[in-house]
Curated annotation (Swiss-Prot):
The keyword Oxidoreductase applies. It catalyses: testosterone + 3 reduced [NADPH--hemoprotein reductase] + 3 O2 = 17beta-estradiol + formate + 3 oxidized [NADPH--hemoprotein reductase] + 4 H2O + 4 H(+); androst-4-ene-3,17-dione + 3 reduced [NADPH--hemoprotein reductase] + 3 O2 = estrone + formate + 3 oxidized [NADPH--hemoprotein reductase] + 4 H2O + 4 H(+). The gene is CYP19A1. GO terms for biological process: brain development; cellular response to estradiol stimulus; estrogen biosynthetic process; female gonad development; memory; negative regulation of testosterone secretion; positive regulation of cell population proliferation; positive regulation of estradiol secretion. Heme binds at C437. This is Aromatase. InterPro entries: Cyt_P450, Cyt_P450_CS, Cyt_P450_E_grp-I, Cyt_P450_sf, Cytochrome_P450_Monoox.
Amino acid sequence: MVLETLNPLHYNITSLVPDTMPVATVPILILMCFLFLIWNHEETSSIPGPGYCMGIGPLISHGRFLWMGVGNACNYYNKTYGDFVRVWISGEETFIISKSSSVSHVMKHWHYVSRFGSKLGLQCIGMYENGIIFNNNPAHWKEIRPFFTKALSGPGLVRMIAICVESTTEHLDRLQEVTTELGNINALNLMRRIMLDTSNKLFLGVPLDENAIVLKIQNYFDAWQALLLKPDIFFKISWLCKKYKDAVKDLKGAMEILIEQKRQKLSTVEKLDEHMDFASQLIFAQNRGDLTAENVNQCVLEMMIAAPDTLSVTLFFMLILIAEHPTVEEEMMREIETVVGDRDIQSDDMPNLKIVENFIYESMRYQPVVDLIMRKALQDDVIDGYPVKKGTNIILNIGRMHKLEFFPKPNEFSLENFEKNVPSRYFQPFGFGPRSCVGKFIAMVMMKAILVTLLRRCRVQTMKGRGLNNIQKNNDLSMHPIERQPLLEMVFTPRRNANENQGDGMDQH
């Protein structure tokens, strides 16, 4: 009887469906369930990070890099998801890492020596499979690197000390060239001029227009930073990338002229030994057929922009920190007077300037300029338990790493952070391993020589309310102050113990 009662209900159930759910809704529900399953599948990734979300996730993450800049985006993702994060750039899986053990693993292994970036962007700036900085062809990079290694070490490293002293002194004597209408010093421009001059004297050795080349380098860097991660469609819209292409062409053209001057000079000198610098070695390698003219031009360009691009900003930030921390300045000056005295700094002084060295390290930790390293996995791997597929992009967020582990006062500027020996895995401003910064040793020599020479001559001061935290910065490919702001100006005052001929160039300031 019960079954008989239920049977009519069974037979008539379909007649009730239209009243409660339209038939057209059923396929939509099925599709939604299918998409929900896909969504859930993507969310089960063992690596923290934003979800794939039917392809929306990769678009959003790439868009965030373009909108915020590489450095800011990396900090956002690490802060939000942890020290090992999966995102996407140009649809490619990308890991952002700020954990010291993972960072060390990547740096020390050869299968992470390749770089990544937009092929069209790198082609536009001349770095695609060329030069050394972003050359993503490991075989060709290995052929090019020895030219840089030779120029940046050995006799060249020792010569650079005297060159830095000479250049710093000359530029301090010509401070009027970087003095504003209010009588203040454009310290960043001063550092850029010194860096370009020292690079030219050691690596190229031809007359050049400092001011013009510095401006061309700034524009080239802006193009490099803007184009590195742009999607391919950007390059199909000519008016969008015209100004960047023009900036690249401008610097390349200037460098080609300077290199041609070098060729002419080499063809007329009697003793080649006296003129065998970095550019000469490249030119002769081209003559032997080992390099192309394009290789030579790009390598010289990269050698000439490296210091004005990064070291100049690093030194500028250091001058601001010195002005903000007078007790640190006093410690440094006491050491300089003890170690160097009244003479110019020499190579033997370098290892004895411990306080100056700790100041440089702490400045680079607290206010880094290059705070990330970009690599690509050339084979499958596992990093701290996370699977890494061949072709995965890797961004090492070393700037964040330097403020998360080991240091007693990670969020403060304090020389106490380097009072004790710091294990290398916790502090890597230049990286290490097969693709570490090729100029890391000469960079330390240059910074010491320039700081000592400058501080012996004058005291540096910031304008009231214009400290490091007040300066607007752009954290993209590297950390740079936003140009054309009065906060970049400083006051240089001659020291009392400077002799008269040293002080003349700065009396008006």
